[in-house]
């Protein structure tokens, strides 16, 4: 491959201009993020006789991602998360232009999902509509660190279970990804709301007009996704001749 061809592949102009399935992929990312945000923040609403629990919210987000990955994975890969998309750009599994179009679709889907839940929920129940916020006493720097840590875990798991060079993975990749999201919520929801996904925070923030510390939920997850992608590519990506005989057999 020439240097010019390599650059074109990384940028990915042909992914947009020549790929006849690109619109299906973008619609899949829109719908996937729409349902992620709608179902996810729907679990956070507090009614007069019922308040959501941390466990309920954690498993709702994890299960909806696992389910959507099964539904849309064959179409777009079901990233439904800018941090995941950027992490895959770092490992050259997704081109820059395709990734940019994915992220726009994800953000629009997140806004639509939040808007539908707000419209379908009584005003006295809407509350903050699942807008993520930093816990009192936590600095924005600490918030960025927490979001980076839990997003690193998520994106690293995505790379690990979706590495098509591996021959030892026999379990459910979507379930593993969903459980990593559940684990992140169980550990960090009390710190930052456990976003792990810039689009998940962006949608409710836009609909509610509440942009307080929103940058934390872009910077933290994106940094975590980039580092996870780089670490996986440099040290853990399966290469020809690698020995996998000692891998866990799921």
UniProtKB/Swiss-Prot annotation:
PROSITE patterns with a match to the protein in the record: MIP
Gene Ontology CC annotation, any one: plasma membrane
Topological domains, Cytoplasmic: 1-26, 78-99, 159-168, 232-250
Lipid bilayer topology: Multi-pass membrane protein
Residue intervals passing through the bilayer: 27-47, 57-77, 100-120, 138-158, 169-189, 211-231
Compartment annotation: Membrane
Annotated signal sequence range: none
Assembly notes: Homotetramer.
Domain statement: Aquaporins contain two tandem repeats each containing three membrane-spanning domains and a pore-forming loop with the signature motif Asn-Pro-Ala (NPA).
PANTHER family with a match to the protein in the record: AQUAPORIN, AQUAPORIN TRANSPORTER
Chain's role: Forms a water-specific channel.
Name of the molecule in the record: Aquaporin AQPAn.G
């Amino acid at each position: 491959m020439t240097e010019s061809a390599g650059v074109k592949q990384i940028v990915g102009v042909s992914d947009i201009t020549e790929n006849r399935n690109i619109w299906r992929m973008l619609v899949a990312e829109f719908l996937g993020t729409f349902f992620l945000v709608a179902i996810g923040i729907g679990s956070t609403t507090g009614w007069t006789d019922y308040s959501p629990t941390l466990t309920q919210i954690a498993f709702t987000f994890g299960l909806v991602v696992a389910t959507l990955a099964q539904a849309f994975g064959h179409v777009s890969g079901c990233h439904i998360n800018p941090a995941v998309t950027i992490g895959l750009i770092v490992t050259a599994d997704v081109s820059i232009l395709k990734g940019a179009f994915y992220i726009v679709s994800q953000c629009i889907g997140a806004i639509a999902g939040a808007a539908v839940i707000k419209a379908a929920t009584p005003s006295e129940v809407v509350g903050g509509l699942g807008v993520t916020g930093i816990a009192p006493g936590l600095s924005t720097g600490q918030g960025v660190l927490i979001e980076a840590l839990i997003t690193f875990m998520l994106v690293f798991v995505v790379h690990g279970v979706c590495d098509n060079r591996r021959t030892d993975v026999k379990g459910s990749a979507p379930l593993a990804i969903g459980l990593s999201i559940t684990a992140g919520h169980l550990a960090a929801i009390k710190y930052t709301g456990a976003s792990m996904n810039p689009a998940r925070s962006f949608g409710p923030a836009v609909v509610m007009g509440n942009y307080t510390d929103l940058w934390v939920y872009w910077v933290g997850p994106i940094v975590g996704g980039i580092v996870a992608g780089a670490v996986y590519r440099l040290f853990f990506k399966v290469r020809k001749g690698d020995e996998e005989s000692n891998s866990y057999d799921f």
